[in-house]
Amino acid sequence: MATFKDACFHYRRVTKLNRELLRIGANSVWTPVSTNKIRGWCVECCQLTELTFCHGCSLAHVCQWCIQNKRCFLDNEPHLLKLRTFESPITKEKLQCIIDLYNLLFPINSSIVNKFKKTVKQRKCRNEFDKLWYNQLLLPITLNAAVFKFHSRKVYVFGFYEGSSPCVNLPYKLVNCIDLYDKLLLDQVNFERMSSLPSNLQSIYANKYFKLSRIPSMKLKQIYYSDFSKQNLINKYKFKSRIVLRNFTEFTWDFQLSLHYDLFNNKDKIFAALSTSSLKQFETHDLNLGRVKADVFELGRHCKPNYISSNHWQPASTISQCKWCNVKYAFRDMDWKMESMYNELLSFIQSCYKSNVSVGHCSSIERAYPLVKDVLWHSITKYIDQTIEKLFNVMNPVQVNNQKVISFHWQIDIALYTHIKMILKTERLPFTFTLDQFNSVIKGIVNQWCNVNELDNLPLCTEQTDTLVRLEEEGKLAEEYELLISDSEDDD
């Protein structure tokens, strides 16, 4: 087990390039760090162990040893983890780069075998080529990769992943790319590598190679917002932002293959990039469709629909003395935009409900209560129109000129009054609402702060470092820019 980790340790003194690239955290002094009960393969050292969350992408893919290096596969520093990373689509040229990388850093020939033979002290317990002392020579070249699926974008991190795991809660799945290359050609590459090994090590090498090179691919897993750590989220003035650490260098490569070209033909550029790299901190906004969905679900779970039957004049989120309407605790860490949406939505529904249904107190039990929760839960789904229509129908609409309308004459605060006028694009609010107007107001309140159709699916921490640097230079990392205010806001 952990053949890749052992190979990094023993091969690190072979060449100057190896000394720079093969220094991984798993072979350094251990520093204590909390684990998350997620068992899987660390993509940096490839050992099967308990994982913790990465500082660079907030996903659980690094072990408690490698976390101290703070490396991520999304860095732009050309460290070993970055060199083993490719984005889709995977081509034969990219796979050839991985094979050449292994042959460059972990060569197997007679001189290397003799070098390790001299390194291992030949005593009674070590006088043979035993797996225990020569595990670093048993590193076959396979094309297995841990694949992170960020919706339409896939990132492949190639490595020698030994062992088996149920892969529960892992943000990635293991995929075998041998069919995209050539099985016989890869077999030939490994036969040439093992030809320099002693006979007893050859059998172990071959067994490892055929066992891992022929495993079937797992079904890819879509990464969701729940897969990201909340440990690096900060809450300033009810704005949520995420602290992201990346290894950054001023050197850039236009194409993924150009980095590997420089590795073989322009090593000075690689050394310069490694020696001048630094750890750069980004404070990115956390506004994305995944988080909005999570917040809306929490909003619906904590919602107290009894408010629409009450006579409370205060905003719904500030009610603290009424046992039927108290949700103040739920908004302790909630984003202020969600709180604003909740207040306006329940205040509007309260005004419509009290205008049409005879109800006197928030302790009463009403048919509309489940529908209020459904409006919140479906506010950013395709079922929102059906849910709004159901809520409209329980308010006893009447037929006027072949159109159902509800009355609207209950008190509302001036801010909501102004917002509804802006949504309906009218100078004066009507005393009746049609279904279309009722629908437009609810959707306008939901979309006041962000247009969910334009939001990214995942946090910005999934972007490449070069992208984060460009967004920072353009001033687009802060949430104030990415609020994506709706068009109706501009018409005010």
From Swiss-Prot:
Pfam families: Rota_NS53. Keywords: Host cytoplasm, Host cytoskeleton, Host-virus interaction, Inhibition of host innate immune response by virus, Inhibition of host IRF3 by virus, Inhibition of host IRF7 by virus, Inhibition of host RLR pathway by virus, Interferon antiviral system evasion, Metal-binding, RNA-binding, Viral immunoevasion. The keyword RNA-binding applies. It comes from the Viruses. Signal peptide: none annotated. Residues 82-176 are annotated as: Important for cytoskeleton localization. GO terms for biological process: symbiont-mediated suppression of host cytoplasmic pattern recognition receptor signaling pathway via inhibition of IRF3 activity; symbiont-mediated suppression of host cytoplasmic pattern recognition receptor signaling pathway via inhibition of IRF7 activity. Transmembrane segments: none annotated. A motif (pLxIS motif) lies at residues 483-486. Residues 1-81 are annotated as: RNA-binding. Residues 42-79 are annotated as: Zinc-binding domain. Belongs to the rotavirus NSP1 family. Interacts (via C-terminus) with host IRF3; this interaction leads to IRF3 degradation. Interacts with host IRF7; this interaction leads to IRF7 degradation. Interacts with host CUL1 and CUL3. HAMAP family: ROTA_NSP1. The integrity of the zinc-binding domain in NSP1 is important for degradation of host IRF3. This is Non-structural protein 1. It comes from Rotavirus A (strain RVA/Rabbit/United States/ALA/XXXX/G3P11[14]) (RV-A).
